[in-house]
Amino acid sequence: MNIFEEKNPRKKYLLFVCLGNICRSPAAEGIMKQMAYDNPQLRGEIIVDSAGIGAWHTGQLPDNRMREHAARRGYDLNSRARQVKPEDFDRFDIVFGMDEENIADLKRVARNNDERAKIRCLADYMTQHPEYSTVPDPYYGTGRDFELALDLIEDACREVAERLTKETI
């Protein structure tokens, strides 16, 4: 997304954030973009991006393992990692964190209570996995961990898309 582009007040701007912006948040970005494209009510109506708390992977593509697992489900993860910054709160309507640490870090990046009110935990939107309160980081895990992360993100993004369609988010 071009940060210099003028914000369209009729569109919803969503930012997904994880620790390094190479596993969970780019997956959420890719999944949400595909869900929006597949939904005629949302196509062209939402702008989606992702970022990381840290800058370690800036400029890199998502982790190859996440890209491979996502590709098997039909998602193209081709964004480049970047670090979240305070100005993101000017641009985005909702900022989703993946776990408690992300949420706490985002609250520190936010400059005021209005910006903090934009922060949500993506797991709060899961409807099929009530046993999870976060989207666990698969980075040090196995293929099963990447599949689980994708399952949880898909679940939450379906609900986010549903609420966006009904304008209840």
Please place each PLM-identified region on the residue numbering.
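Conserved active-site segments centered on acidic
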Residues: 2-91, 162-169
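Helix N-cap/beta->alpha junction signal
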Residues: 25, 99-100
